[in-house]
Amino acid sequence: MRIFIDSANIEEIKEINGMGFLAGVTTNPSLVAKEKKDYKGLIREISMLVDGPISAEVIALDYQAMVQEGEELASIHPNVVIKIPLCEEGLKAIHALKQKGIATNATLVFSANQALLAARAGASYVSPFIGRVDDTGNDGLTLLDDIVQIFDQYMVETEVIAASIRHPMHVVASAKIGSNIATIPYQVIKQMVKHPLSDAGIEKFMSDWKKAF
């Protein structure tokens, strides 16, 4: 399972990219708004930092405007993937962008039906939001498992991105289920690195070394 960071913060992306495992970045309008920077300029900057897919979401909600905005964002860098919200207009836009050779990421996916439709429309990726499904009292990991099983059953080429990751165990479960990718917030990645026994072991090694020398 590949690891993406879900962030639009340049310093966060630089830090995590420096660890050597980062394979891509996902952004959304909320994350971009926090940075208070020019949208296209920010996507361009991220694209120069990370050698992998960079998801940039359209703001428009009608098909023609989505396609136009998607083409503009895709022109920033070859690695830019256009995030399209799952709706009727979005499915039309996904199909149109596919015909133009532009990669898409169907976002705000909350059912296996939605994921299947997006894949058949031509989405390069689908992003089920497991944490938000959990928030409704349902099981987001069951949704992820359903999508992975259906795609495996029919050899669907669309890749699955486990999104709305809330804690490290979401990552472990996503990997066990067989998700192609997990896109993970900065703070959760930091939690994944840490373990109290690792910290205690490092502290003991350093203490023993100082005593010996």
Curated annotation (Swiss-Prot):
GO function terms (MF aspect): aldehyde-lyase activity; transaldolase activity
Pfam family, one: TAL_FSA
Record's subcellular location: Cytoplasm
Major site of localization recorded for this protein: cytoplasm
Pathway: Carbohydrate degradation; pentose phosphate pathway; D-glyceraldehyde 3-phosphate and beta-D-fructose 6-phosphate from D-ribose 5-phosphate and D-xylulose 5-phosphate (non-oxidative stage): step 2/3
Reaction catalysed by this enzyme: D-sedoheptulose 7-phosphate + D-glyceraldehyde 3-phosphate = D-erythrose 4-phosphate + beta-D-fructose 6-phosphate
EC number: 2.2.1.2
Gene Ontology CC terms, in alphabetical order: cytoplasm
Active site: 83
Keyword terms of this UniProt record: Cytoplasm, Pentose shunt, Schiff base, Transferase
Biological process, per Gene Ontology: carbohydrate metabolic process; pentose-phosphate shunt
Function summary: Transaldolase is important for the balance of metabolites in the pentose-phosphate pathway.
Family: Belongs to the transaldolase family. Type 3B subfamily.
Protein's name in the database: Probable transaldolase
Species per Swiss-Prot/TrEMBL record: Syntrophomonas wolfei subsp. wolfei (strain DSM 2245B / Goettingen)
